[in-house]
UniProtKB/Swiss-Prot annotation:
Residues annotated for GTP binding in this entry: T108, K109, A110, D111, G155, Q156, S157, G158, V159, G160, K161, T162, T163
EC number: 3.6.1.-
Pfam name, any one: RsgA_N
Description of how the protein assembles with itself and partners: Monomer. Associates with 30S ribosomal subunit, binds 16S rRNA.
Predominant cellular place of this UniProt entry's protein: cytoplasm
Keywords annotated in UniProt: Cytoplasm, GTP-binding, Hydrolase, Metal-binding, Nucleotide-binding, Ribosome biogenesis, RNA-binding, rRNA-binding, Zinc
Lineage: Bacteria, Bacillati, Mycoplasmatota, Mycoplasmoidales, Metamycoplasmataceae
Gene Ontology, cellular component aspect: cytoplasm
Family: Belongs to the TRAFAC class YlqF/YawG GTPase family. RsgA subfamily.
Encoding gene per record: rsgA
Domain of life (superkingdom): Bacteria
Coiled coil: none
Name this protein carries in UniProt: Small ribosomal subunit biogenesis GTPase RsgA
């Protein structure tokens, strides 16, 4: 039988088959011996009431959260409470785009104000949606994004991910208030799982977090963003880090000077590069 892994709990995989029936099964030990770990989103073959016997080749996979075969990863970032942080957005995007997955930006709590970065990110080619929980109009606007797609939500704790999931699915996941002391919400989501939404769409909500190690090399980071990858082809050196190289040797620096790449994006990139250098020491 064939199916898709919808959730994992203590080594038991919840698989939805082609007839929309669910099966809770372990995986064959051979996967463990080969250091292959089944992930939420994997397409698999299994023997009914026995084991997962095969994992099909993945379109892509992501480390945090551990998921496979993803169409979009949606970065959920609040405009206020907590304040919008372009550095975190760019950090997530570097991580996402390096895995060849398309990032999308959801700006929540739009009723509290507008984000000055919306136009900036749209000019860079990203889809940006502003979401106000005062109205349900945004639900219609995002529906097409989910049609026949598997999308992941990721972002800081306290930015409204759980409220967003509740609105989309009609479920009632636990919502916890912002901690005024820490200025971030407490973690509410625990298990990575697929939830069916809209027209044959799939949503994977993930645990919120306030920090994320980038886990990229300097070379991977330098060509992580789609725009950097395209413009970086014209740098004089293939190993250009767009950092200390002369401006006439680095096409990324030239693009910043020409306002093709926003200054804030380049500044965030340099900050990320410093993080990578510190991690590698």
């Amino acid at each position: 039988m064939k199916g898709k892994i919808y959730s994992i709990n203590s080594g038991i995989y919840s698989i939805k088959d082609e007839n929309n029936n669910f099966h809770n099964l372990p995986a064959l030990g051979v996967f463990r011996h080969k250091n292959i770990v089944p992930l939420v989103g994997d397409y698999v073959e299994f023997e009914k009431e026995k084991y997962i016997t095969k994992i099909y080749e993945r379109q892509n996979e992501f480390i945090r959260p551990k998921v496979a075969n993803i169409d979009h990863i949606i970065i959920v970032m609040s405009i206020h409470e907590p304040e919008f942080q372009s550095f975190l957005v760019d950090k997530y995007m570097a991580f996402i785009e390096s895995a060849n997955i398309e990032p999308v930006l959801f700006n929540t709590k739009a009723d509290l104000g507008t984000s000055k970065y919306k136009n900036e990110y749209e000019s860079l080619g990203y889809k940006v949606y502003e979401i106000s929980y005062k109205t349900d109009e945004w639900v219609k606007n995002i529906a097409k994004l989910f049609t026949n797609k598997t999308n992941v939500l990721m972002g800081q704790s306290g930015v409204g991910k759980t409220t967003l999931v509740n609105k989309i699915t009609g479920s009632n996941f636990a919502v916890q208030a912002i901690s005024k002391f820490a200025n971030r919400g407490k973690h509410t989501t625990r298990i990575v799982q697929i939830v069916n939404v809209f027209d044959n769409g799939e949503l994977i909500d993930t645990p919120g977090f306030s920090s994320l190690d980038i886990n990229l090399t300097k070379q991977q980071l330098a060509y992580s963003y789609k725009q950097f990858k395209e413009l970086g082809k014209f740098c004089k050196f293939k190993t250009c880090f767009h950092q200390n190289e002369p401006e006439n040797f680095c096409n990324i620096k030239q693009a910043v000077k020409d306002n093709i790449i926003p200054q804030f994006r380049y500044n965030n990139y340099l900050k990320l590069l410093q993080e990578v250098e510190n991690e590698q020491k």
